[in-house]
């Protein structure tokens, strides 16, 4: 349970009451809807830290969070209580944000399942009754579509079960999907014909090709990579010059990266021995930023 800390006398008096366990217990017992109340073992009401709240939400919430165990004792329930003396149109979304933050904090504590978080709003403003829906889905421009999206499983693109023939029809996504589906295979030479067919379509630009082949190189070994890209170049002569240029550039970048990493290693050894930083930079030709990054 959390209580607002905005600086009004309404908030202050509400907080002064609801910070006490017995008062909080009575509030939940009286006002939580009966079906939800039956889930809670209010004898286990416990004050929890809520330092996990992000800066945007800190202006609305105090450092009080109450949890209760379920009647079956197999899980936790959090009750979020918010006080308002003025109605807020997007209040349900704000409470949802806090609820999700509480769920994440619960997982960060080592639990493996999401807890139930029950938001409640205590209102005593001038406008009566409360004028806005407290279902956050009603706050979308298209509530009906929002209900379809957030009340069912999210779309999944599991490329591992998509047939290669179908992937080949996926236009500008096809080459990426094909490579990522099969990237864990020891030998990618079996994909050469399909890759050549996709290169001919011109759906992949040079930057994407370089990124893709660099990905293949990073996840395999150099010897197999050379055979792989060489075979593609032979099967796609119109792309051969471009592919070999990319391969050469990747090899050069790999060599440069290796030299840079070796320089960083030497610099660290020199610094560990107490040598002057200026001398280290002169010997290794590293920049001050390189040394700062290395120290972290």
From Swiss-Prot:
Keywords: DNA recombination, Endonuclease, Hydrolase, Magnesium, Nuclease. Disruption phenotype: A quadruple rpnA-rpnB-rpnC-rpnD deletion shows no change in basal RecA-independent recombination. The keyword Magnesium applies. Transmembrane segments: none annotated. Its EC number is 3.1.21.-. GO terms for molecular function: double-stranded DNA endonuclease activity. It holds the Pfam family Transposase_31. Signal peptide: none annotated. InterPro entries: Rpn/YhgA-like_nuclease, RpnA, Transposase_31. One of its GO terms (biological process) is DNA recombination. A low activity DNA endonuclease yielding 3'-hydroxyl ends. Upon expression enhances RecA-independent DNA recombination 19-fold, concomitantly reducing viability by 98% and inducing DNA damage as measured by induction of the SOS repair response. NCBIfam families: T_den_put_tspse. Belongs to the Rpn/YhgA-like nuclease family. This is Recombination-promoting nuclease RpnB. It comes from Escherichia coli (strain K12). The lineage of its organism: Bacteria, Pseudomonadati, Pseudomonadota, Gammaproteobacteria, Enterobacterales. The gene is rpnB.
């Amino acid at each position: 349970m959390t209580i607002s800390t905005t600086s009004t006398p309404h908030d202050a008096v509400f907080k002064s009451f609801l910070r006490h366990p017995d008062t909080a217990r009575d509030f939940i017992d009286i006002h939580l809807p009966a079906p939800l109340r039956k889930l809670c073992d209010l004898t286990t009401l416990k004050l929890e830290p809520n330092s996990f709240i992000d800066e945007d939400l800190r202006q609305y919430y105090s450092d009080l969070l109450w949890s209760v165990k379920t009647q079956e004792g197999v899980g936790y329930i959090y009750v979020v209580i918010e006080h308002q003396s003025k109605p807020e149109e997007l209040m349900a979304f704000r409470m949802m944000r806090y609820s999700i933050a509480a769920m994440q904090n619960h997982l960060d504590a080592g639990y493996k399942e999401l807890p139930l978080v029950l938001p409640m709003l205590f209102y005593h403003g001038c406008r009566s009754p409360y004028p806005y829906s407290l279902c956050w889905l009603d706050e979308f421009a298209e509530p009906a579509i929002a209900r379809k999206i957030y009340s069912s499983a999210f779309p999944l693109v599991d490329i591992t079960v998509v047939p290669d023939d179908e992937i080949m029809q996926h236009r500008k996504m096809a080459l990426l999907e094909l490579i990522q589906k099969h990237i864990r295979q020891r030998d990618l030479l079996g994909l050469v014909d399909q890759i050549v067919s996709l290169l001919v379509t011109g759906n992949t630009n040079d930057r994407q090709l370089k990124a893709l082949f660099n990905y293949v190189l990073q996840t395999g070994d150099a010897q197999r990579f050379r055979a792989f890209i060489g075979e593609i170049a032979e099967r796609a002569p119109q792309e051969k010059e471009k592919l070999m240029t990319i391969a050469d550039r990747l090899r050069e970048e790999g060599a440069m990266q290796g030299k840079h990493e070796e320089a960083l290693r030497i610099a660290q050894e020199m610094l560990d021995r107490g040598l002057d930083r200026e001398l280290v930079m002169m010997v290794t030709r590293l920049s001050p930023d390189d040394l700062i990054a290395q120290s972290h």
